[in-house]
């Protein structure tokens, strides 16, 4: 499969994550690698590091889109670390680079990535993350999952290029 056909999935969440969020992100990284996906993340600690670690341990490829000018603070588990110098604006690159986004917990940076992805038409699956709603929406635009396995099942339903 060429990189044009390979699904890119962003795993997003906070750098100061809970133990559950870290375990969930690591499991997601493993499952994505085993499914042949490329993991995209913000490249730093917490959920980002845990997802990259799980991906790497399963032999997968992970790309970190870093906010700073250098790679010194990048997760050591990344396959590729890209220093943007864009600060939080790098969230747009994370959202744009992915065919789908999985949000695990998270704070305001995660919320911005969710909003950007949804605005771009990219599906978002959430595990213990923000709930969004407005009076004119009949449902939360984030597809909910309780486990990493359920999140991948939703990806298979939502993303045509996502394999079996």
Task: Write out the residue ranges for each language-model feature.
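Generic N-terminal amphipathic, Lys/Arg-enriched alpha-helix
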Residues: 4-19, 29-35
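A charged, well-structured terminal subsegment
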Residues: 96-101, 145-164
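Acidic, glycine-centered active-site loop in nucleotide-sugar glycosyltransferases
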Residues: 137-141
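Short, low-complexity, intrinsically disordered N-terminal peptides in bacterial proteins
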Residues: 1-6, 162-164
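A short beta-strand-loop structural module common to alpha/beta enzyme folds
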Residues: 38-45
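Acidic/glycine-enriched connector segments
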Residues: 23, 27-30, 45-120, 128-132, ...
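Short acidic-hydrophobic, aromatic-tinged amphipathic segments that line or gate anion-handling sites
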Residues: 81-85, 125-127, 142-154
């Amino acid at each position: 499969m060429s990189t044009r056909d390979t699904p890119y999935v962003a795993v997003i969440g906070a750098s100061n994550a809970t133990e559950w969020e870290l375990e969930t992100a690591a499991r997601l990284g493993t499952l994505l690698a085993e499914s042949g996906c490329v993991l995209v993340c913000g490249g730093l600690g917490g959920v980002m590091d845990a997802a990259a670690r799980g991906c790497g341990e399963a032999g997968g490829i992970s790309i970190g889109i870093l906010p700073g000018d250098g790679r010194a603070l990048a997760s050591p588990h990344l396959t590729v670390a890209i220093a943007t110098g864009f600060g939080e604006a790098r969230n747009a690159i994370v959202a744009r680079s992915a065919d789908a986004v999985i949000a695990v917990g998270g704070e305001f940076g995660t919320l911005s990535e969710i909003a950007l992805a949804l605005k771009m038409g990219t599906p978002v699956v959430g595990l213990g993350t923000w709930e969004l709603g407005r009076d004119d929406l009949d449902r939360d635009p984030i597809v909910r999952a309780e486990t990493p396995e359920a999140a991948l099942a939703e990806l298979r339903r939502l993303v045509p290029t996502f394999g079996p």
